[in-house]
């Protein structure tokens, strides 16, 4: 089983230790909703928060492309928001995206990622979570490139 498959399986099991085993001690992880995190302690906190704020996770890796230094995956992600997110409690969210894993040590099958980043249309997820279109416009406008 390769790194991407191990990551998805650990996530779907809500296995924080299994997830941490996919990353180097000093790994950088850039999450679309939770922002950037560096190092195992920060990653642990982020994953624990995710699992408090959501349930019934399903992270399906639809396509995986890899070489000796990186892996990229197209995916479909879904979950249900919990009471930890009162404005969205009980809402089911489903969206697609892509992730890039930069490998530490360069060996995909048994290696760990030193960096992770993901790309998706967060607007779709935020609408499903019940954000008003006006609020969504405000949030997304912060991402517009500046000259």
Where are these regions (language model features)?
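Helix N-cap and loop-to-helix transition residues
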Residues: 15, 38-39, 121, 132
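A beta-strand edge to alpha-helix "cap/lid" segment located at domain peripheries
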Residues: 48-147
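A solvent-exposed, acidic/Ser-Thr-rich amphipathic alpha-helical stretch
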Residues: 16-20, 24-70
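A structural signal for well-ordered alpha-helical scaffolds and beta->alpha junctions
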Residues: 4, 40-43, 94
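Residue-level recognition of hydrophobic positions within alpha-helical transmembrane segments
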Residues: 11, 27, 114-117
């Amino acid at each position: 089983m390769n790194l991407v498959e191990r990551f998805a399986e650990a996530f779907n099991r809500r296995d924080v230790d299994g997830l941490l085993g996919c990353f180097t001690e000093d790994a950088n992880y850039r999450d679309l909703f939770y922002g950037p995190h560096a190092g195992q302690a920060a990653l642990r906190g982020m994953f624990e928060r995710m699992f408090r704020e959501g349930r019934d996770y399903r992270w399906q890796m639809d396509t995986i492309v890899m070489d000796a230094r990186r892996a990229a995956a197209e995916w479909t992600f879904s979950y249900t928001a919990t009471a930890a997110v009162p404005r969205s409690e009980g809402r089911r969210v489903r969206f697609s995206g892509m992730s890039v894993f930069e490998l530490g040590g360069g060996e995909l099958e048994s290696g760990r990622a030193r960096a992770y980043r993901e790309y998706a249309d967060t607007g779709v997820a935020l609408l499903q979570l019940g954000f008003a279109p006006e609020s969504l416009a405000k949030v997304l406008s912060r991402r517009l490139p500046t000259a």
